[in-house]
């Protein structure tokens, strides 16, 4: 792997530790968050530096309901340093929907200089397909799929694939390649604009009926 993105749900608070960890391992980091729109569709906001990602995460987090989070029921929501020491516990439930609509998330991401990518658009939960039934017209930088075809028309947008890993063992199960002199956020942005990024590990048409992970 040459580039790795950290996109926690509705927060980017772990971006500083992630930057240091990637520097240690010689991997180019992408920063961001997997936002939940007010329609309850997941959206990736990807950035080339921690600062805009942190601002994106701050606005997302502040828009979440203030209802108390139950760590016993749902597990801990922690911010760590580069040595995995816990420095903060987040009190708002990160799985909930933000106050931003899909289009509002796109404007915010672009305002901060990021890439606006609807996540796993063909899944049966928390996707534009499951929530809206179609991909609304908008200024997406790419569209993330888990299968080659079926369910939803992704239009003219570049299709990518990502691990969507919630445990280490799932990292790299799906991934995207693109040609560049060196891996960087700018090179990725150009590759998406020119449709020179290619998804790997997504399911074939014959696998569509199989359970999703």
Which residues does each PLM region occupy?
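Charged catalytic cores and adjacent phosphate/nucleic-acid-binding surfaces used
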Residues: 1, 12-58, 77, 93-94, ...
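Ser/Thr-glycine-rich phosphate-binding loops at phosphate-binding pockets of nucleotides
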Residues: 5-7, 11
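Phosphate-interacting basic helix/loop segments used at nucleotide- and nucleic-acid interfaces
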Residues: 98-108
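Divalent metal-binding segments
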Residues: 10, 87-98
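Active-site gating loops and adjacent loop-to-helix segments of metal-dependent hydrolytic enzymes
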Residues: 48-91
